[in-house]
C-alpha cells in the first residue's frame, strides 16, 4: 500500500428530483457502462410505481426505509489462525453498511421475474420495507453466519 497521504472522499451531489444523497449513490450503483440517464429513468420509474401502488406512503420514505432495513449489522471475515481458517464475526462500518444494502437490493431486483427493471426495483424496495424479499434474505443469511460463528469473535482483526 502506498504510504502517501489519504485520498479525500469525493462529495456526491444530491439527486436533481428529490435532493437526496443516498438516492444519488443508489443511482451510481444501478448505473452500468456510464449510462446514468438510464439508471435515473429506472430509479425514478420505480419510485413512481411505488407512489402509485402505495399512495398513502411517500416513495422516498419507502426507499430510505428499505435501505435501512437491509443494512447488515455484522458480517464474517476469514481469519487464518494456526493452519485453520475461522469465520470471525465483525461489525460492519457505516459506509460499507450502506454500500452492501444498495448492492444487495440491486442484485435481488435483477433476479426477480417482472418485465422491466423499474418494476423489479419497485417491488424489491416495497418488500424490503416490509422485511421480506431477496435482499432481506441475504442480510438474514449474513447475520445467521455471524451468529453461528460467535464463538470465534475473540479472534479480532
Swiss-Prot record:
Ribosomal protein is among the record's keywords: yes
Transmembrane regions listed in the UniProt entry: none
Keywords: Ribonucleoprotein, Ribosomal protein, RNA-binding, rRNA-binding, tRNA-binding
Signal peptide positions on this chain: none
Gene Ontology terms, MF aspect: rRNA binding; structural constituent of ribosome; tRNA binding
SUPFAM superfamilies, per database record: Ribosomal protein S7
GO biological-process terms attached to the record: translation
UniProt keyword DNA repair, yes or no: no
PANTHER family noted in UniProt: RIBOSOMAL PROTEIN S7
Family under the similarity heading: Belongs to the universal ribosomal protein uS7 family.
The protein's name: Small ribosomal subunit protein uS7
Species the sequence originates in: Acidovorax ebreus (strain TPSY)
Amino acid at each position: 500500500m502506498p504510504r502517501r497521504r489519504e485520498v479525500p472522499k469525493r462529495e456526491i451531489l444530491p439527486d436533481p428530483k428529490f435532493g437526496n444523497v443516498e438516492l444519488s449513490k443508489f443511482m451510481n450503483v444501478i448505473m452500468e457502462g456510464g449510462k446514468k440517464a438510464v439508471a435515473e429513468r429506472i430509479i425514478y420509474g420505480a419510485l413512481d410505481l411505488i407512489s402509485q401502488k402505495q399512495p398513502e406512503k411517500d416513495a422516498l420514505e419507502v426507499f430510505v426505509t428499505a435501505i435501512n432495513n437491509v443494512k447488515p449489522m455484522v458480517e464474517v471475515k476469514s481469519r487464518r489462525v494456526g493452519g485453520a481458517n475461522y469465520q470471525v464475526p465483525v461489525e460492519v462500518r457505516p459506509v460499507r453498511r450502506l454500500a452492501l444494502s444498495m448492492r444487495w437490493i440491486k442484485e435481488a431486483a435483477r433476479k426477480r421475474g417482472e418485465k422491466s427493471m423499474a418494476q423489479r426495483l419497485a417491488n424489491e424496495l416495497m418488500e424490503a420495507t416490509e422485511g421480506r424479499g431477496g435482499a432481506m434474505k441475504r442480510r438474514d443469511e449474513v447475520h445467521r453466519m455471524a451468529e453461528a460463528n460467535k464463538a470465534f469473535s475473540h479472534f479480532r482483526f
